C-alpha cells in the first residue's frame, strides 16, 4: 500500500470513529436533557453557518490583500495563482498578514472566496522554493475542502467547549457568591457538570486532532503532486519555522507573543535539522495533542514520497 492509499485509509477510519463518537455524545446529551435531535441539528447548522460566514474576517483580520499588479507582492499573487492552476482549482485570494510568527494558512468560504494568508516573518525566512512548497500545501487544503470539513468535524467539540467554559465560570462565580447551602450545592453542581463536559470534549478532541493531522499530511501530499522532488523544500521550510519559533516567547502577563533575544538553538542549519528529523524515530503518541503531525514525521513522509523507502 503506497503513501496515498495509507493516508486515505487512515482518514476513512479516523473520520468514521470521530463521527461515531460525536454521534454517541450527541444522542447521550439529547437523552439526558430530553431534547429532540430535530431541535439540536438545526441549532448546530445555524451555528456552523455563523462560523462559516464570519470566520474569514476573524482569521484574516488586519491582512493586506495582494493584487496581481501589486508593486511589492504581485509576484506572490502570481505564485499562488500558478500553484492553484497546477492543482486544478480556482486561484484563491492572497493576503499578507503582519503577525509576529511565521505561518501560512488556508481559510475563507465560497461566498467571499477562499483565501491564503501568509505572514511577513514567513516571507522573510523562506526562499522561493520553500515558499512555493508551503503554498502548494495550503492550496492542497483548499482543493481538499479542509476548511469546511475541519469546521464541520470540530463543531460539536467546539459547542461543548463553550458550554463547559460557561458552566465552570458560572460555577466559580456562584461558589464565591454562595450565601447558603442550596446556592453552594448549585455552584458545585455547575462545576461538576462543566468538568464532565470538559472531559468529554477532550476525548472527542483527540479524534478530531487525529483527523486534522491526517488532513495536514494529505495537504503535504498535494505539495508533492504539484512539485515532485521540489516538495523537498517543504521539509527545510518546516525546519526554518521550527528554529524561528524557538526564539519566540509569550509574555506571561499579557499573553502577547513577543520576539525574544536570540537564544541557543541546538540546530541552526535547517538542512542539518532535516537530516536529524530523517533519523528520528517518532513515537505514535508524540503529536497526539497537536493539530499538525510532528515535523520529523512530515519530513519523513515527504522524503519517502520522493525517494521511496531509501531515505
UniProtKB/Swiss-Prot annotation:
| HAMAP family for the chain | Pept_M48_protease_HtpX
State the UniProt keywords alphabetically.
Answer: Cell membrane, Hydrolase, Membrane, Metal-binding, Metalloprotease, Protease, Transmembrane, Transmembrane helix, Zinc
Q: Where is the active site?
A: 138
Name where it mostly resides: membrane
Biological processes annotated in GO: proteolysis
Name by which UniProt lists this protein: Protease HtpX homolog 1
**Compartments where found:** Cell membrane
Molecular function (GO) terms for this protein are: metalloendopeptidase activity; zinc ion binding
Task: Report residues binding Zn(2+).
Answer: 137, 141, 216
Q: Indicate whether Methyltransferase appears among the record's keywords.
A: no
Any idea of its EC number?
3.4.24.-
Per the record, what is one GO cellular component? plasma membrane
The lineage's top-level taxon is Archaea
The record's listing under Pfam families reads: Peptidase_M48 (PF01435)
Cofactor-binding details, from the entry: Binds 1 zinc ion per subunit.
Cofactors needed by this protein, per the record, are: Zn(2+)
Q: Which InterPro entries match?
A: HtpX_protease (IPR050083), Pept_M48_protease_HtpX (IPR022919), Peptidase_M48 (IPR001915)
Chain ranges passing through the membrane: 12-32, 35-55, 159-179, 184-204
**Bilayer disposition of the protein:** Multi-pass membrane protein
State the family it belongs to. Belongs to the peptidase M48B family.
Amino acid at each position: 500500500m503506497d503513501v496515498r492509499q495509507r493516508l486515505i485509509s487512515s482518514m476513512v477510519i479516523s473520520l468514521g470513529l470521530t463521527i461515531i463518537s460525536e454521534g454517541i455524545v450527541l444522542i447521550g446529551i439529547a437523552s439526558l436533557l430530553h431534547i429532540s435531535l430535530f431541535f439540536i441539528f438545526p441549532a448546530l447548522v445555524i451555528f456552523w453557518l455563523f462560523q462559516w460566514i464570519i470566520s474569514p474576517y476573524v482569521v484574516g483580520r488586519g491582512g493586506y490583500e495582494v493584487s496581481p499588479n501589486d508593486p511589492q507582492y504581485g509576484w506572490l499573487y502570481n505564485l499562488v495563482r500558478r500553484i492553484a492552476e497546477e492543482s486544478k482549482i480556482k486561484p484563491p485570494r492572497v493576503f499578507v498578514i503582519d503577525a509576529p510568527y511565521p505561518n501560512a494558512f488556508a481559510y475563507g468560504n465560497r461566498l467571499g472566496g477562499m483565501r491564503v494568508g501568509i505572514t511577513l516573518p514567513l516571507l522573510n525566512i523562506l526562499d522561493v522554493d520553500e515558499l512555493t512548497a508551503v503554498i502548494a500545501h495550503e492550496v492542497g487544503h483548499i482543493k481538499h475542502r479542509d476548511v469546511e470539513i475541519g469546521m464541520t468535524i470540530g463543531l460539536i467539540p467546539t459547542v461543548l467547549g463553550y458550554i463547559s467554559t460557561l458552566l465552570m465560570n458560572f460555577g466559580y462565580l456562584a461558589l464565591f457568591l454562595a450565601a447558603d447551602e442550596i446556592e453552594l450545592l448549585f455552584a458545585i453542581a455547575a462545576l461538576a457538570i462543566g468538568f464532565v463536559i470538559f472531559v468529554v470534549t477532550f476525548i472527542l478532541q483527540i479524534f478530531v486532532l487525529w483527523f486534522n493531522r491526517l488532513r495536514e499530511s494529505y495537504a503535504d501530499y498535494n505539495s508533492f503532486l504539484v512539485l515532485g522532488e521540489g516538495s523537498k523544500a517543504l521539509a527545510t521550510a518546516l525546519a526554518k519555522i521550527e528554529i524561528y519559533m524557538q526564539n519566540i516567547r509569550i509574555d506571561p502577563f499579557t499573553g502577547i507573543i513577543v520576539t525574544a533575544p536570540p537564544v541557543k538553538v541546538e540546530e541552526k542549519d535547517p538542512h542539518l535539522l532535516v537530516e536529524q528529523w530523517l533519523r528520528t524515530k517518532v513515537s505514535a503518541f508524540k503529536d497526539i495533542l497537536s493539530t499538525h503531525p510532528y515535523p520529523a514525521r512530515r519530513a519523513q513522509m515527504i522524503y519517502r514520497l520522493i525517494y521511496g523507502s531509501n531515505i
